[in-house]
């Protein structure tokens, strides 16, 4: 019975066509999401790599604790991303959620760059804020793709976004 179901579902699938790629890249919203994805992840992941040095050298946090504070960021996203995803499901406003998260990331990076800000408590608040932003953006970014891309091209669209992200 299962073999018959698999055969039936395989017959319903459309084959990949290069024309799908050209149709997807003509959608303006696709480029907004792809560029946001590149900029977002390139603002967060490199920061996490160098954040322990920043905590130690700028904020005077002990070497032992300087790695713990930035490490809290991914754990916070585990808790917050489903919450913000649910908010997006109930209220919509995906563009607003992505914009708020993006502006928060920019603000946090700018505040980290201010030489006069050296208080360890400020560093903790900024990391928490970055964690909130790190949850906001993907909770609305990834579910926005099916809203702008036809269902039969979703796999190709997600693959293109990851491909563009790897180039970025």
What kind of feature is each model-predicted range?
Residues 27-78, 138, 142:
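Extracytoplasmic gate region of multi-pass secondary transporters
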Residues 52, 56, 88, 145-150:
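Helix-terminus/helix-capping segments at the ends of transmembrane helices and short amphipathic helices
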Residues 94-144:
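C-terminal transmembrane helical hairpin of 12-TM major facilitator-type secondary transporters
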Residues 2-34:
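Juxtamembrane intracellular "pre-TM" segments in multi-pass secondary transporters
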Residues 151-168:
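A late C-terminal transmembrane helix in Major Facilitator Superfamily
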Residues 80-93:
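Helix-to-loop junctions at the C-terminal end of transmembrane segments
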């Amino acid at each position: 019975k299962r073999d018959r179901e698999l055969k039936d579902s395989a017959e319903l699938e459309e084959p990949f066509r290069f024309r799908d790629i050209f149709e997807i890249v003509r959608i303006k919203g696709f480029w907004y999401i792809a560029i946001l994805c590149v900029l977002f992840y390139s603002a967060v992941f490199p920061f996490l790599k160098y954040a322990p040095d920043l905590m130690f050298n700028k904020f005077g946090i002990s070497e032992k604790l300087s790695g713990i504070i930035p490490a809290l960021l991914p754990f916070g996203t585990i808790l917050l991303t489903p919450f913000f995803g649910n908010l997006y499901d109930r209220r919509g406003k995906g563009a607003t959620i992505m914009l708020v998260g993006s502006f928060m990331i920019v603000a946090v990076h700018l505040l980290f760059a201010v030489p006069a800000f050296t208080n360890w408590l400020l560093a903790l608040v900024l990391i928490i804020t970055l964690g909130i932003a790190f949850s906001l953006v993907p909770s609305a970014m990834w579910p926005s793709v099916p809203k702008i891309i036809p269902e039969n091209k979703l796999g190709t669209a997600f693959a293109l976004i990851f491909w563009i992200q790897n180039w970025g």
